[in-house]
């Protein structure tokens, strides 16, 4: 059988650096191929080659699609072949309707006039195909991320896509939205649509794939039948070594209470009658990792924003750090007191993309390198160099714009920023979201190094295995309330979910 897609000996260089070094992949019609690898392994570069972002002539190797050698130079040419890529960062126009987004740039006309009746009828068919029950005139900005993801797929199908490339499609989705998306991908496979699926969530990769291809350091490590591979097999191929334990727990001492939170309530920014956090109280001890678990919408991020002084709505309650009552009206108040927070969305709230790695690292501690209003460049450069070395931030140099780093290295740079302020309490909101398994492991090890130094860590995570693998104690939140405060003594995922959905409060 002739493969639908065959990419042979693909080489792509940036200067003297080989981002891709002789990569080969192929897939059949109606097949799902998952592409796995650490951040910076070359997955995205390979897909940019396939989709015309890096045009023919800008790389070496051959691409054959449906039996024909193709030499595309634009994304439009790729789409005309039937290849569509859906990026992690969605490209929809939020102010336009669903219908307008579906046909943007490909409007249906009759005698030179836009035919809205035909577009409406086609939109209804496309939305039905992706199992999205919304009116075509709905404003896209009013829909959830999961629904917007389905609109992107519908848009690709409107162009008769035969091959979908999905780049981290479930990273921002809830569990139920993820189930809907995976079911749709399976349905499309049955209809003969092929898919290249890129994800760090190896349980999804195992569940949905026919074949799994692993790339490491720009090289093709291997492609194997998904049914024959375990998660450990995938990880070993990705990182080049066997990882005996994904969560590297280390013994550490837990001391006296360092943070005390009393009766925190926070009201919705959009509706002042709705409580997002409802009368929450808890304590945190020195050298403790406190996991905060709960379903999406439980109020976890809002609670952390209150503790960091950056919640945009109205909130009340008391926070005591080492016995002293704090006034937290801004991030500056929190940082001055000794509370630092690595935010949930690093791209929107964590990094300044056009600034250098070094500038991002020292952003919160510039006063430490300033004397009489003048910045001491030598002192700052020394601190940057030490931070990059201590957190193993992989960057050619500190002057590179941080947007060019992988997600894991961006996250480590943000961590470096807040460690420079010498915090007593470090809040990590979804610290490993969207980063690969190797970078996750490094961040877990760093967390244990920090608590050994006496720093107390609050970790918010939607990944229950992560919460159970790292935390000393777990707070379980549901609908703004704490439903459980549990010592992590062989806790199970079922116990946490039962606690979240139970009417009782568990301690």
UniProtKB/Swiss-Prot annotation:
MF GO annotations: ABC-type D-xylose transporter activity; ATP binding; ATP hydrolysis activity
EC number: 7.5.2.10
Top-level taxon of the source organism: Bacteria
Database matches in CDD domains: ABC_Carb_Monos_I, ABC_Carb_Monos_II
Cross-referenced Pfam families: ABC_tran
A single GO cellular-component term on record: plasma membrane
Limits of the ABC transporter domain: 5-242, 259-504
Known catalytic reactions: D-xylose(out) + ATP + H2O = D-xylose(in) + ADP + phosphate + H(+)
Top-level enzyme category: translocase
SMART domains in alphabetical order: AAA (SM00382)
InterPro entries reported for this sequence: AAA+_ATPase, ABC_carbohydrate_import_ATPase, ABC_transporter-like_ATP-bd, ABC_transporter-like_CS, ABC_transptr_XylG, P-loop_NTPase
Keyword list, A-Z: ATP-binding, Cell inner membrane, Cell membrane, Membrane, Nucleotide-binding, Repeat, Sugar transport, Translocase, Transport
Subcellular location per the Swiss-Prot or TrEMBL entry: Cell inner membrane
Binding site for ATP: 37-44
Primary location group: membrane
Membrane topology: Peripheral membrane protein
Family to which this protein belongs: Belongs to the ABC transporter superfamily. Xylose importer (TC 3.A.1.2.4) family.
Binding partners and assembly: The complex is composed of two ATP-binding proteins (XylG), two transmembrane proteins (XylH) and a solute-binding protein (XylF).
Function: Part of the ABC transporter complex XylFGH involved in xylose import. Responsible for energy coupling to the transport system.
NCBIfam families registered for this protein in UniProt: PRK13549.1 (NF010069), xylG (TIGR02633)
Protein's name according to its UniProt entry: Xylose import ATP-binding protein XylG
Organism: Photobacterium profundum (strain SS9)
Lineage summary: Bacteria, Pseudomonadati, Pseudomonadota, Gammaproteobacteria, Vibrionales
